[in-house]
Amino acid sequence: MIPNIFHFVFGMAPDFGGKPFSLVHYLSVKSAVELNQPEAAIFHYQYEPTGEWWEKAKPLLTLKQVKAPESIMGNPLLHVAHKADIIRLQALQETGGVYLDLDTISVRPLTSLYHHEFIIGQELKAAFVPRNWRQKLKKQLGWTKENSVASTGLCNAVLLAQKNSRFINRWLE
């Protein structure tokens, strides 16, 4: 079972990747905490943010300072986002729970999904899909209306996992 623990990752570089903690980040934390009432909402950071919105978010969070990894499996991690990717996976591997990117606004509780071992989102993009393909997809996928979106892969902006989930363990191998 996925524990009701939320994880957020931010501040893997001193300049925050040019994006200081903002209203959107605060709303991400606030909506997740209010809707899901987690046992803990853990904020993983190397460099602690500052500012008005950070001061509002801080009381909702348990702070966990981490050292951003420089490499994985002998390969250097050159981008801040890749360092954050590893931190989020390690956090879920260690305690399980829910990881949300800080631009994700919660609109419903996620507790009904906690019986799964692992959940990852699907990345979609608007695309032109020919009418005959849409009709086939509608029939095969049980859509109630025709969609004009296409999958571009998996998205790690929202992850739910049991502690030591097989999927994350394999991902980190």
Put a short name on every predicted segment.
Residues M1, F128-V149:
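Membrane-proximal basic amphipathic "stem/tether" segments
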Residues M12-A13, T152-L154, E173:
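Flexible glycine/proline-enriched surface loops and loop-helix/loop-strand junctions
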Residues F16, P76-L78, W143-N147, V158, ...:
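Active-site rim elements
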Residues V80-W133, A150-G153, V158-A161:
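GT-A fold catalytic core of metal-dependent nucleotide-sugar glycosyltransferases
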Residues S165-E173:
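Catalytic core and acceptor-binding pocket of nucleotide-sugar-dependent glycosyltransferases
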